[in-house]
Design a protein with these regions (language model features):
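Glycine/tyrosine- and acidic-biased, solvent-exposed loop/turn segments at the edges of beta-strands
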Residues: 1-172
Length: 172
């Protein structure tokens, strides 16, 4: 292993990335930029296996922030829309497995849903709101029952468009 501090540049001379590298692989602290010069990603080495990652959209708004442990999302992660409004927030166990209470927001800043994750399925009360803040659905879901939520939302009068948004919020 031959670790070197390197700086890479775009053809226009703008910095692309810099930090410690093992060959072409970033190791530890690392920063990258968009070709426009705006910061894209910052990685701060917390321990040998934990790195704090912060990502930005090209417009300068923060995109996501959280810790990677052994290359997987771990602990509290927060995500934002490119307009600066919060998109989602919740906890990961090892290997990107969601756990506990997760919150999801519509792009206009209104709360979209709150639910309890157990892995990638539900395990508890899930509440959904439309883009104007009206509660549209609330129900306890256990394990694989969360897959039934889409039909239950439609039965409660949610449009296909709104149901599709919830799917993207929860599973993307």
């Amino acid at each position: 292993m031959s670790i070197k501090y390197l700086t890479f540049y775009y053809p226009n001379g703008q910095k692309k990335s810099e930090g410690n590298y093992d060959g072409q692989e970033p190791i530890g602290d690392h920063t990258s930029w968009f070709e426009s010069g705006n910061i894209k990603c910052e990685a701060v080495d917390l321990t040998e296996s934990k790195i704090l990652f912060t990502h930005w959209y090209e417009n300068g708004q923060m995109k996501s922030k959280g810790v990677h442990k052994d290359y997987f999302e771990s602990g509290l992660w927060t995500y934002w829309y490119d307009n600066g409004n919060k998109k989602s927030e919740g906890f990961y166990l090892d290997k990107d497995e969601r756990v506990g209470k997760w919150k999801f927001w519509h792009s206009n800043g209104e709360l979209a849903c709150i639910g309890i994750h157990k892995g990638w399925s539900g395990d508890g009360l899930w509440t959904f709101w439309d883009e104007t803040g009206n509660k549209v659905h609330e129900r306890e879901y256990r394990e694989s029952e969360l897959l039934d939520v889409w039909e239950n939302l439609r039965a409660d009068g949610c449009s296909d468009e709104l149901v599709d948004k919830y799917k993207k919020y929860i599973f993307n």
